[in-house]
């Protein structure tokens, strides 16, 4: 991703087809040591392609991917388990209420 970001920075800055040394110099300004193989791979993949068209195609593909997870619903038939769970929750709430009343707010630094 960092290689692509450097490539995009260079193209936005006016370089029509950034070279490997251009990308490496951008990355070195922020303290990243570039891997020559990855830079060459990126350049070969993007060579001769219009960046705006690639971004538009990527946005179109991303729009088809669901971004929010579906809400998980429990399976039907768990009434007995639900009753036990609610009883356990009530017991926890009672314990929490008892604990908070014990020190009357003055036991913080005792």
From Swiss-Prot:
> At which residues is Phosphoserine found?
100
An example Gene Ontology cellular component term from the record? cytosolic large ribosomal subunit
Q: Where is this region: Disordered?
A: 73-110
* GO molecular-function terms, A-Z: structural constituent of ribosome
Do the record's keywords include Metal-binding? Answer: no
A single Gene Ontology biological process assigned to it is: cytoplasmic translational elongation
List S-S links within the chain: none
* Subcellular location per the Swiss-Prot or TrEMBL entry: Cytoplasm
Quote the InterPro entries the UniProt record gives.
P1/P2_N_sf (IPR038716), Ribosomal_P1/P2 (IPR027534), Ribosomal_P1/P2_euk (IPR001859), Ribosomal_P2 (IPR044076)
Top-level taxon in the UniProt lineage: Eukaryota
**Additional detail:** Yeasts contain 4 individual small ribosomal A proteins (RPA) which can be classified into two couples of similar but not identical sequences. Each couple is distinctly related to one of the two A proteins present in multicellular organisms.
Q: How does it assemble?
A: Component of the large ribosomal subunit (LSU). Mature yeast ribosomes consist of a small (40S) and a large (60S) subunit. The 40S small subunit contains 1 molecule of ribosomal RNA (18S rRNA) and at least 33 different proteins. The large 60S subunit contains 3 rRNA molecules (25S, 5.8S and 5S rRNA) and at least 46 different proteins. The acidic ribosomal P-proteins form the stalk structure of the 60S subunit. They are organized as a pentameric complex in which uL10/P0 interacts with 2 heterodimers of P1 and P2 proteins.
Biological role: Component of the ribosome, a large ribonucleoprotein complex responsible for the synthesis of proteins in the cell. The small ribosomal subunit (SSU) binds messenger RNAs (mRNAs) and translates the encoded message by selecting cognate aminoacyl-transfer RNA (tRNA) molecules. The large subunit (LSU) contains the ribosomal catalytic site termed the peptidyl transferase center (PTC), which catalyzes the formation of peptide bonds, thereby polymerizing the amino acids delivered by tRNAs into a polypeptide chain.
Family membership noted in the UniProt record:
Belongs to the eukaryotic ribosomal protein P1/P2 family.
Per its record, how is this protein called by name?
Large ribosomal subunit protein P2B
Q: Which organism is it from?
A: Schizosaccharomyces pombe (strain 972 / ATCC 24843)
């Amino acid at each position: 991703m960092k290689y692509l970001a450097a490539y995009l920075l260079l193209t936005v800055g006016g370089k029509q087809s950034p070279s490997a040394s251009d990308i490496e110099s951008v990355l070195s300004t922020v303290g990243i040591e570039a891997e020559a193989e990855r830079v060459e791979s990126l350049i070969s993949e993007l060579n001769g392609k219009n960046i705006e068209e690639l971004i538009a195609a990527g946005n179109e593909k991303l729009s088809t991917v669901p971004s929010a997870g579906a809400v998980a619903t429990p399976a039907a038939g768990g009434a007995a388990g639900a009753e036990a769970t609610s009883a356990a929750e009530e017991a926890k709430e009672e314990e929490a209420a008892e604990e908070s009343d014990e020190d009357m707010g003055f036991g913080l630094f005792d």
